[in-house]
């Protein structure tokens, strides 16, 4: 059985990080973009990371942050991986000594094979729905049929996923991992532990057939 990995993004509190880990999440994401309702300070993220059990990957999400901003954040909080959600180029993404994910906003005409070629140093491409003025956490899905079946690097599917549609997403797309933020929230920026559990159960149920 192939197991779909799960990332819960936009974690701001230790109780929600633990809820995700205890339910079986493989990774949690911290949003270090101040324009986001899910923004977390590096010190608050460090407090969350400190209570996580082993083997839960911590991912830091950045949007067009400066080199200094990212390095200052890395000094403040232990991160296992970076996620770039803006207009960052491959050399910049690879310059911090950590593996990274490259987010791709799926607007009309987006060529994921071209992105995979440009960002061959990325551990995965993370697809998200294109909404003007927003960088992730849109709560909207996109047409999954445009995703190529022969991507040379792993795919993380994101964009409008929730416990009701993630099973179908796993079945149709067969991504390496799924990523969720707004789909497990009680209100914008506030995670709901019950929704986190329901989401992870839905993924595991689909994996089990």
Predicted regions and their residues:
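Conserved N-terminal beta1-alpha1 strand-loop-helix module at the mouth
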Residues: 1-209
